[in-house]
């Protein structure tokens, strides 16, 4: 997997994994929030310098270990973090993650054009695959003035954009904020606010950051809670209230997004409108900020000031 880095140069990295599904995918037939992963084994893992793109040679492969060992047996619902690994990623280059895992029911990340990811069942012929197990969090040891996280669905994750272009709003704001701010994108395709409420592990990861952007609503309106019906505006309001309450209790500043425009039919559009009318009251209740309008306006200078 070719992964863009936030800051170039030599840094100490750690990689976090959880063997539990963070959020419901599609209707939940294959994966749903809280589903336990199966037992699997990590045979080896490396990070490397991927050059400026997939046509470049992969160099500087560096082993990743877990408790001092290259091999790790992972149990269902286990969360774990790699040992520290130091690697230098030059300007404009990608960090490449490579590993060999064996088992069944391993939670994966649906990348969907975000980056180049390939897989092979026998290590010979590698083909494009946007459903592969990856670290849920990649962290580098850096001196920063502020930390920012975003939790939401595919609009936050960025999987609707052209492959490896990184022109979605979260990527743009990360670039605009510069090296003084560390940004963690916790968006997941198909995610609902109800998923975040049901999975404290996922929500707790973003609670460690100074400021958290909360951007849910679309999939709650379209699909609703896993094993449930489409959510009403009042139900989504309740989920968002729980999320913002949790984050503010943890000491986070919260920026709450409204539900963005979509090609909704009349009934769903009515839910979106009703939800957006309720969001300011949630923000006022907990001292959060609200971002109105489309996502592009967030990268304007006056909107970036919200983060500080």
Feature locations, PLM:
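A structured beta-alpha segment of the ubiquitous adenosine-cofactor-binding alpha/beta core
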Residues: 291-306
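N-terminal secretory targeting modules
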Residues: 1-151, 156-157, 161-163, 249, ...
């Amino acid at each position: 997997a070719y992964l863009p880095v936030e800051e170039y140069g030599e840094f100490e990295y750690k990689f976090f994994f959880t063997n539990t599904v963070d959020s419901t995918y599609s209707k939940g037939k294959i994966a749903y929030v809280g589903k336990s992963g199966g037992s699997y084994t990590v045979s080896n893992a490396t990070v490397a310098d991927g050059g400026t793109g997939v046509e470049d040679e992969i160099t500087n492969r560096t082993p990743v270990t877990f408790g001092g060992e290259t091999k790790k047996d992972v149990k269902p619902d286990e969360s774990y973090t790699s040992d520290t690994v130091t690697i230098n990623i030059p300007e404009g280059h990608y960090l490449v993650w490579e590993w060999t895992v064996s088992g069944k029911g391993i939670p994966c990340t649906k990348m969907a054009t975000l980056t180049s990811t390939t897989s092979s069942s026998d290590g010979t012929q590698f083909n494009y695959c946007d459903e592969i197990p990856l670290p849920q969090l990649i962290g580098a040891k850096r001196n920063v003035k502020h930390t920012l996280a975003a939790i939401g669905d595919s609009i936050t994750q960025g999987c609707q954009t052209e492959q490896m272009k990184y022109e979605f709003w979260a990527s743009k704001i990360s670039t605009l904020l510069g090296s003084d701010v560390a940004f963690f994108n916790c968006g997941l395709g198909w995610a609902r606010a109800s998923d975040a409420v049901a999975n404290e592990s996922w929500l707790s990861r973003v609670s460690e950051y100074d400021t958290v952007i909360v951007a849910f609503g679309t999939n709650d309106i379209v699909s609703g809670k896993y094993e449930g019906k489409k959510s009403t505006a009042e139900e989504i309001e309740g989920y968002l209230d729980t999320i913002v309450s949790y984050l503010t209790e943890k000491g986070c500043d919260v920026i709450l997004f409204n539900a963005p425009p979509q090609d909704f039919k009349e009934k769903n559009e009515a839910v979106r409108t009703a939800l957006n009318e309720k969001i300011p009251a949630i923000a006022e209740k907990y001292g959060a900020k609200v971002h109105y309008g489309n996502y592009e306006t967030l990268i304007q200078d006056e909107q970036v000031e919200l983060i500080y």
